[in-house]
Amino acid sequence: MSQFSTEDEAELQTLLRKLLKSVKDRISGAPSVECAEEILLHLEETDKNFHNYEFVKYLREYVESSLGAVIEVETENFTKGEGHAVGSGQDTLVHAVTKNTRESTQYKQMMQTLKQTMMMVVESLINKFEEDQMKREEMDRKIQHQQSISQYADNCSDSDSSFNQSYAFIKHEQLQVIAEKLDPGRPREVRWEALQSLCHAPPSDVLSCESWTGLRRNLSTALTDPDPELSDKVLQFFAKTFSSSPLNVTKDIYASIGNTKTLEAHFLYHKLSFPSGTTSIDANRPDMARLLKQMRLMNDFQKEVTTFWIRHPEKYMEEIIENTLSLLALHSEQGMSSPGSEKSLEPIHLISLLDIKATWFKKWMHGYYSRTVVLRLLERKYKSLIVNALQQCIYYFDSCDALSEETLEMIHSLEHQQIGPAGRTLYTSKELEFVYFVHSLCVLGRLVMYTNGRKFFPIKVKKRRDPVTLTDLVVILINIMYQHPKPSCGETALADTMSPTNLVMEVLRTLCDRTECAVECLYQIPVIETLLAPLITLLTGKLPKLNSMESALTHTADTLARIATTERGLSLLLYDRNLVSAEGESISAAHLIVQFTQKLLAKELQVENSSSMSGAFIFVCRQMYNTCEGLQVLRPYSLHECIAQAWRTTSSMSERVPTPVPGAPPALASQELQSVVAWEEMLLDNLLNFAATPKGLLLLQQTGAINECVTYMFSRFTKKLQVSRCEKFGYGVMVTQVATTAPGIVALQSSGFVQTIVVELWSALECGREDVRVVHPKSTPMDPIDRSCLKSFLSLVNLLSSPHAVWELLGHRALPNKTEYNLREMATSVLDLMDRLIIINSDAKIHSLFNYEQSHTFGLRLLSVLCCNLDSFLLLESQYKLTDLLLQGQRDNVTEPPSGEGEFIIDGLSVERNHILVRICAVGGPSERKLPPRALQKGNDPYPWPMVSTYPLPKYYIFDVPKILRTKQESEIGAFLTSSKETERDASWMDDCRRQFCKIMATKSNTLTGYVLADLLEMVVLHLSSSSNDCFFPPAEYKVVDNSVKTRSLSSVEQLGVEISLRYGKFLKLLREDSEQDLCLLLKHCQEFLSQQRVKVTSELCGYPGHDWFASTVFLLMHGDVGRSLSLLLRFSRLLPSAFLWPPRLHSSVHLPIEIAQSAIHPIYSCTAHYVEMLLKAEVPLVFSAFRMSGFTPSQICVQWLGQCFWNYLDWPEICQYVTTCVIMGPDYQVYMCVSALRHLQQDILQHTQTQDLQVFLKEEPIQGFRVSNYLEYMEGLERSYRSMVLSDMRSILPRSS
C-alpha cells in the first residue's frame, strides 16, 4: 500500500473532514490560525480519544503495511548481534531500530507519497470549503435579520472568538469590499449584509487588513446609527474583537465605543434626564438599552484590560484611561446641581448601575503601572470626578435619616439585580442616587489607600465653608455607619454586601491594615472621638442617636480593635488624654473603653446586652492588655476578675441548660445552649490572652481559670487556629509564656498539650513519612536534627526551658527501664523521651529504635539544651546520674586492639556526648571555659579536641585564671570606703557612693573586682540596712547558732549545687580546698532563716526547684568567709533588691500576698521579666519582633540568666559587677541589665531567628563581649525614662497593708 489510488484519496478526504469536525470546538476557540495549527499538532498529547479517530487508525495501518517488514528485519538483526534485550537495554533496542528504519529507503518513499497525497486532499477540502461558504452567505441574505435585545444582553460582551461562527479565511479584497459597503451613504440593507459578513470573518484577519482604518471609522458611524439592529451588530463585532486583538487595536475599538463627543451628543440628543419623584428610567427603552449595552461592553473591557496592558507601551494604556475618565466626567456641572433641581442622567450613573462597587477602578488602582497614570490624569484634568464622588457621599450622609426607611428595600432589590427583560428594568431616582453613592464610596475608599491619592485632600465642595480633609471624610463615613438602619430579621445575609455599614467597614478595615493610611486617616483625635462618642453618651446615662445600637457599637469595637493592633494606634488609645469622661475628666480612650466594657459585663448600661457586642469590646481591651504597656494602663481596673466572674456565671448557666424533653421545641433549646457555649468560649479565649505577658499570666493564675484556659487553647492549637483575626502568629509565644511557670506547665500537662507535642515528635523521629514511591525515597538526614523534627525539637525546648517545667514533669519520677520495648510502643510523655532517647542504658532500648543514631543524637541535643539551665541539670543529675551514663558511653565507644590502649571512635554520638560532658563539668563565662564544637574538621585529624571519658576534665577546656590579690589599683575606691566612717555615713553618703561607683565603672572598671568589691558591697548593704527608710522588708530576728542548723541536711540537688559552686570557686582561686563545709553551713543557715518566713501552702507547686546560686555567689565574692557571707545576706534580706537578686528570698514568702505566694510565680518573672519585655519592645523593637517570630520569649531567657545569677553566661568579674550595680544603683537595674544584654546580642539574635535556632543559641551560648561597664551609661538612660514606673511596681509586690 505504498501508493494511493483515487478511492484511497477520497476515503482520506472523508476521514480528515470527520477529524476536523470532531475537534471543531477546540480549534474554533483559537484566537489565530497559528494557534489552531498548534492545537492540531499537539492533539495526541491533549486528546484522550486521539487513537480512536478513523483517520489516525487509517494512517497507522498505512505505516504498518509500508514499514512492517523493515522493522522486523532490523529487530532480528539487532537481537542477533547484541543478545536478549532486558531491563534498561530495551530502550537501546527501540532507539536503534527506530533510527535504522527512519534511514531506510522504504521510509523516505512512504513519507514522500504521504505528503503529496495529503496536499491534494487538503487543497480539495479548501476548495469545497469556499464553495460551502459562498452558499452560506447566499442563504444569510434570505434569513430574517431581526434579533432581540435579550439575545445581545446574553452575548454582547462574551469572550467568544471568530471561530464560533466558522473556521474560515477571508481575503483582503473581500474586506475592502465590506468596508466600502459599510459607508454611511450606502443603503441600510447593504450595510446590514456587510456587517453580517464581517461578523463571520476571523477578527485577526479583519484587524490586520489594510482597510481597517476606514472600516473602523465606518463601524463607529454605524454604532451611532438610529437603527438599533445596525448598532447592535457593531457591538457584537466589537465584543468578539476585544478578546482576540492586540492592545494597540482594542484601544481604538474602545475609543470608538466610548467616543466622548458621540456619547455626549447621544445623552443630549435624547434628553436623558435624571428621574425625579416617582419617575424611573426604563432599561428596555431602545435608547437606554443601547446605552446600557455600550456601557456594559466598555465596563467589561475596563475590568479585563489590566491583565495584559502592561505588555504594551504606556501610551496605549494612557489613551484608554483618558477616554474613560473623559467620558465619566461628562455633565459634571449639571451633575453637581442641587438634588431638587432638574439634572441630566450621566455616564457615571450608568457605570455605577453596571459596576456598583467600582471594580474597574479597583483594578486600575491595584498596579503601580496603571495607578500612576490614573492619579496623574485625575489631578490634571479630571479632579471633578473625585469632587463629585465626595459630594455624593456627603449628600447621602445629609439625607440618611430621610432615606433610612427605604434603604434596606433598595439594598435588597439591588443586591441580586440583573439588567434586562429577565431581571429588573425600572430604576427610581433614589436607587440611582444610592448606587452612585456606593460607587463613589468604593472609589474614594480605593483612592485614599495610596499616598498620592490622599494628596487630593483637602477638597473644596459645595455647601461647605471649609475644604473636606481626610479626617473629615473618615468622620463622615463613621457617621454613615451609625445612621444605617438595623436589618430586619432574615434580611441580614441578603443585605450584607451592599449595606452602607458594611461598605464603610470595608474601607475602614483597609485603612487599618495599611500603616501609612491608618496614621493619616484614622490615628486622629476627631476620628477617635467620633468612634467613642456613643460610649461616652451611654456612660452618662443617655442613649446615643444610633439607628442600630448593637450593629453600630459592634462595628465601632471592631475598628478600635484594629487600631489597637498597631504600635501607633495602641499608643494613641493608651496615652492621648483628649477625651472627656462621664465625670468630666480628661482621660485616654483606653480608660473609656475599659470602663464601658466593665459596665457591659455588669449589665449596668441602657443597651440590649448581646454577647457579640460585649465580646467585641472585650476584644478591644484584649488587644491592649495582651501587651505589656497596655496591661500597665488597664491593670488598675481588674478586668481579669470581671471577665472571670462573667465566665463563672456563664459556665454555671451552661450546666443548668435543661435537657430537651418530648413536646418541647428542640431547636430553641439547642440554639440557647450553643449561644451560651459560644459566649463561654469567648470569655475563656479573652481570659487566655492575659497569658501573653508575664504579669498577665500571674493575673490569669489568680482567677483560678488557668486550667480551663489552657484546655481551650489546646483545642484551638490542635485545629491549627490562629490566636485571633488580628494576630499573625499562632499560640507558640503564649505556650512558651505559660510553660515558664509551675502552674502553667501543670495546666499544659493536664490538657494533653505535652503529650501531643511528644507524640508528634516521636512520629516525625521514629515513624517518619511513608516512602510511597520507590523513585523518591526519604532523603538521608545530613543534620543531627532533621528538618522534619526541628519544629518538635524547638517546641520541646520552649516547653522545658524553665526548671519549674522539668521539676513538674520529671521530678521524683523513676525511669521505666523495661526489659523489652514493643516496636509499636510510642513515647507519650517527657519521661518516656528521657527513657527512650536520652538515657539509653540497655540493648533493649537500642533495639526499640528504628533510627537509633539519629534518635539518640536528637535526645542528646535536647539534653544539652536542658543542662544549660543549672537547676534543671541538678535535678536530672541527681535522679538519673547523667554524668556516669555519658562517661560510660564514651568508654564503650573505644576500639579494642590486640594490644595497647584503644582509640576513640569519632562519630556523631561520641562528639555530642563529649560536648555535654564538658558543658556540665566546666563552669564559667566566655573567657573561662572552652566548649568543644559539634562539627568535624577537614583533613587528617577531623576532631583534634580531647575526648572526655573520665573526670577531671582535660586542662585544654579550662582557661587559667590568675589569683585575685589586693593591689594598689584598688586604692581609689578603697580610699573612699576607708574615708567614710560610720558616723559620717549620712543620707548623702549613698549618693556619693553611686557617683564614685559610676565614675570608676566608666574609667577603671577592671579595678572593681576581688576584695575591694566585697568591701564595697558589704559597706553599702550595711549602710542601707541601717536606715529605716531604705529597709523594705520588716526586720526578722534570726539567731545564728551553728549547732542547730548542722542537723539540717541538704537535698541531693543542693549537694550537687555545692559541688559545682566549689569547683567554680577553686577554678577562680577564690576558695580553699576545705571550703565545702563552710558553704554547706551557709546554705543551711539561709534555709533555716528563709523557712521561718514562708507560708504553709497546700499546693504541690511550691517546692523551690534548685540551688541557691545567689548565696553561692556571695560566698565566692567573700572568698569563702562564711561569717561575712551570712552577715551580708541577713542584712541584705531587709532590702528591696533581695526580692529580685535572691530568688529563694521571696519563694512562698509571708511578705507576699497569699494568692501570689500560693501561685508559685516569682516576682522575678511577673515583675522583672515583664518589664524586660516592655522595655525591649520600646527600646530594641527588632529583637522583640525576633522573639515573637521564633515562638520564644525574652522572659524565659531572662529568668534563666537571673535564676542562676548569670553563671555560665558572663565571666566572674561581670557577675560581681552585676550584683553590685543592682545593690548600689537599685533593683530596677536588673531590668536594664537584661535589656542591655539582649541589645548587645541584637545581631546574633536576628541571625539565629533566620536559622530557626534562637532559643538554642540563647541557652547554649555565653554572652560574648558583654561588659557591664560599657552599658552602664545606657542603663542610666533607661533609669531616667522608666525608673518611676519599674521601681514603683517592684515596691508594690508587698500587700498594701504592709
UniProtKB/Swiss-Prot annotation:
Function summary: Required for high-level Shh responses in the developing neural tube. Together with cdk20, controls the structure of the primary cilium by coordinating assembly of the ciliary membrane and axoneme, allowing gli2 to be properly activated in response to SHH signaling.
Keywords: Cell projection, Cilium, Cytoplasm, Developmental protein
Primary localization class, coarse: cytoplasm
InterPro entries cross-referenced by the UniProt entry: BROMI_C, BROMI_M, BROMI_N, PHAF1/BROMI, Rab-GAP_TBC_sf
Record note on disruption phenotype: Fish are viable during embryogenesis and early larval stages, but exhibit curvature of the body axis and hydrocephalus, and curled cilia in distal kidney tubules.
Subunit annotation: Interacts with cdk20, which promotes cdk20 stability and function.
Phylogenetic placement of the source organism: Eukaryota, Metazoa, Chordata, Craniata, Vertebrata
Entry protein name: Protein broad-minded
Residues annotated as domain Rab-GAP TBC: 1171-1283
One cellular component term from this protein's GO annotations in UniProt: cytoplasm
Subcellular location: Cytoplasm; Cell projection, Cilium
Protein's organism: Danio rerio (Zebrafish)
Swiss-Prot/TrEMBL GO biological process terms: axoneme assembly; cilium assembly; non-motile cilium assembly
